[in-house]
């Protein structure tokens, strides 16, 4: 029956007035069966894995990230949109798989989570494939060449890079830009310099920044989530400092001014976690002993929130730590990120129980995809490993250099430089970009040496943009696109080096 359907399409396209739609019939035939094209010149190689099946393997590798996107967006939407402060408290105090499963089964429900997630992700996926496919078909008909299989991967990668609240018309505009401008104008699949999915996201990021950053990470209706958070904070008596919010790790990092120093964060952490020793303990204790002369009977790890704020924001001459009062909430928030407190724990970051772009939240899901791509030989492990090494070493160097230059364990260096290097690998879209974006075979280098340099460069630029550039909370997208631009140059020098060695 399927073969009869395909043959009927071919018969229609053989008529004179429908011959221009031959690429459509060819694409349907190739998708349902196998390519009908034969090589016209040597070498003649028979291989069961054609481009279509190669693309399908990448889609299979994306299954864990896709399921994670559906599941996590559903959970976050139900919790943040509930208006129930007790439900939010229970969610934020989850510790371990047993408590997480208990919360899901008893408080929200599995089917409710899946349905809420599907309502968020499925429309974006349909828009991506529909609009992107229409652009592919249009150019194939105009140019009279076959429709390439590249959209199979781009169509699912693109919605995974978006926030769940993105308006549908913006999602359509972004995929159209990615397919047309970054791919078709360069000649189509295999000829593009930049990654189409990332190009579409970059277009939206610079054209509509308010819809791509800020409070856009939960549900599908930002206003509903905002009203729900206000109601929960009011019910629980939360302040702006310790209230519920949908801020991400990177948004918290990006909104922390350089005037928030490591000593401020350590002082807050020693009080929250009741730690008897933090890296800058000597500086804190020295100042605290002066401050307690006018506040007798207080202990550093047993201060109330008001007392802690008073100590941290008092002038240095009075025994305080000299932080501006208006920046205490930023220091309090970045403490959670640096020390992995509450919703920003390393477990939540690794497994994906956080807010963020749809496909970037779960590092574990990305690692499953990475293993599949490496085992099947689809993606380059060299690019992945070098990307991770570049990011880790750069983050570690920021910390070490700050300590060496400032002294006193970096007490008066910006706090943002002291996020543990391994946690940088879990933040934002680094894992997703490392596995699925940086390894794009078309826009990345082909030579082994070039792949190592390419990955190191992207990892370095990712952390540099995160920690230095206040305009962009995430550096992965810009770093990979910049790496795409330099990929041909890296290949050129790698080939020259190889030729010299051969001679």
From Swiss-Prot:
| Transmembrane stretches, start-end | 55-75, 120-142, 161-181, 186-206, 361-381, 387-407, 417-437, 452-472, 475-495
Q: Name one GO biological process term.
A: transmembrane transport
PTM-bearing positions, type FMN phosphoryl threonine: 248
Q: Where found, per UniProt?
A: Cell inner membrane
Q: Which residues form a coiled coil?
A: none
In terms of domain of life, where is this protein from?
Bacteria
Q: Which InterPro entries match?
A: NqrB, NqrB/RnfD
The annotated topology with respect to the bilayer is: Multi-pass membrane protein
Supply the EC number(s).
Answer: 7.2.1.1
Q: Which UniProt keywords apply?
A: Cell inner membrane, Cell membrane, Flavoprotein, FMN, Ion transport, Membrane, NAD, Phosphoprotein, Sodium, Sodium transport, Translocase, Transmembrane, Transmembrane helix, Transport, Ubiquinone
Q: Which Pfam families match?
A: NQR2_RnfD_RnfE
Cofactor entry: FMN
List the GO terms this entry assigns under cellular component, sorted alphabetically. Answer: plasma membrane
On whether Ubl conjugation is a keyword of this UniProt record, the answer is no
Say yes or no: keyword Cell membrane present.
yes
Family, according to the entry, reads as follows: Belongs to the NqrB/RnfD family.
NCBIfam families the record matches: nqrB, PRK01024.1
**PANTHER family according to UniProt:** ELECTRON TRANSPORT COMPLEX PROTEIN RNFD, NA(+)-TRANSLOCATING NADH-QUINONE REDUCTASE SUBUNIT B
Q: What is this protein called?
A: Na(+)-translocating NADH-quinone reductase subunit B
Its lineage reads:
Bacteria, Pseudomonadati, Chlamydiota, Chlamydiia, Chlamydiales
Encoding gene, per UniProt annotation: nqrB
């Amino acid at each position: 029956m399927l073969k009869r359907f395909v043959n009927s399409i071919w018969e229609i396209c053989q008529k004179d007035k429908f011959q221009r739609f031959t690429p459509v019939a060819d694409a349907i035939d190739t998708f349902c069966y196998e390519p009908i094209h034969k090589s016209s010149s040597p070498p003649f190689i028979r291989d069961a894995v054609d481009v279509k099946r190669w693309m399908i393997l990448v889609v299979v590798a994306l299954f864990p990230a896709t399921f994670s996107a559906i599941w996590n967006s559903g959970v976050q939407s139900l919790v943040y949109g509930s208006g129930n402060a007790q439900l939010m408290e229970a969610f934020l105090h989850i510790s371990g798989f047993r408590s997480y499963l208990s919360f899901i089964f008893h408080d929200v429900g599995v089917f409710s989570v899946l349905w809420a997630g599907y309502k968020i992700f499925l429309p974006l996926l349909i828009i991506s494939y529909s609009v992107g496919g229409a652009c592919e078909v249009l150019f194939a008909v105009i140019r009279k060449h076959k429709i390439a299989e590249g959209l199979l991967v781009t169509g699912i990668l693109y919605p995974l890079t978006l926030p769940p609240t993105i308006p549908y018309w913006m999602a359509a505009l972004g995929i159209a830009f990615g397919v047309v401008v970054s791919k078709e104008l360069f000649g189509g699949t295999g000829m593009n310099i930049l990654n189409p999915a990332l190009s579409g996201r970059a277009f939206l990021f610079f054209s509509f920044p308010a819809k791509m950053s800020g409070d856009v990470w939960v549900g599908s209706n930002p206003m509903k989530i905002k009203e729900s958070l206000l109601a929960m904070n009011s019910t629980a008596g939360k302040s702006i400092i310790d209230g519920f919010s949908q801020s991400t790790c990177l948004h918290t990092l990006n909104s922390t001014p350089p005037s928030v120093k490591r000593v401020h964060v350590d002082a807050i952490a020693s009080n929250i976690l009741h730690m008897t020793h933090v890296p800058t303990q000597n500086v804190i204790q020295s100042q605290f002993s002066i401050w307690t002369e006018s506040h007798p009977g207080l202990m550093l790890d047993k201060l109330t929130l008001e007392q802690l704020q008073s100590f941290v924001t008092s002038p240095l001459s009075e025994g305080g730590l000299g932080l501006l009062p208006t920046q205490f909430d930023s220091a309090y928030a970045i403490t959670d990120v640096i020390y992995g407190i509450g919703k920003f724990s390393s477990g939540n970051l690794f497994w994906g129980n956080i807010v963020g772009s749809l496909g970037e939240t779960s590092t574990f899901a990305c690692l499953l995809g990475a293993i599949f791509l490496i085992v099947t030989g689809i993606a380059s492990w060299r690019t992945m490993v070098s990307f991770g090494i570049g990011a880790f070493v750069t983050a570690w160097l920021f910390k070490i250099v700050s300590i060496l230059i400032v002294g006193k364990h970096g007490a008066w260096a910006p706090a943002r430089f002291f996020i543990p290097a391994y946690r940088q690998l879990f933040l934002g879209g680094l894992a997703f970009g490392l596995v699925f974006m940086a390894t794009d075979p078309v826009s990345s280098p082909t030579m082994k040496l070039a792949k190592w340099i390419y990955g190191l460069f992207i990892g370095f630029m990712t952390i540099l943009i995160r920690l230095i550039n206040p305009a962009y909370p995430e550096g992965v997208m810009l770093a990979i696109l910049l790496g795409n631009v330099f990929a041909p140059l890296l290949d050129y020098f790698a080939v020259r080096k190889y030729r010299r060695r051969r001679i």
